[in-house]
Amino acid sequence: MTWSAHDVAAELRRRLPGLGTKRLHKLLYYSQGHHLAAVGEPLFGESIGAWDMGPVVDALWVAEKRGVGGGSAAALDEAALNTIGYVLSRYGALSGDDLEAKTHREPPWRLADAVRRPGQSAPIHPQWMHDYFAGDIADVPPTGLVAVGGPDAEDTPDELRAWAARGA
């Protein structure tokens, strides 16, 4: 079952009172990625975009900027709660800046960033997240990507854009 990013955000905020916006969006990204890898379906239906500051759930960002909140942690099932618990145990102690830096080194954000225009967002495809979090992308060093037939650390931004445009 797929929930709303608002529901997942409500649970993250319940578990981490005072959770800031940047940190929230990175934890949503990690929750989505780990749920895709473990369960095989999205945790929430909204798309995630690559922004300058890392992954952001576009629709949630816009709604909250307009003062529209909502979401109910009570709607989530055991699998969703387990994913969130795992993500918090793994990433919950990191700051928003730490999470931003971490996401910028990971293939899903890098692939989307390679095709986005400065100051704009580009979608982070769920398949990229699934593959990365499931470990299908081998040896991801902090400085680059390594994947069979894919980009590597020496690729220029133009080469990354061309690779992503081929639908890889």
Where are these regions (language model features)?
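Domain-edge interaction signal
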Residues: M1-A168
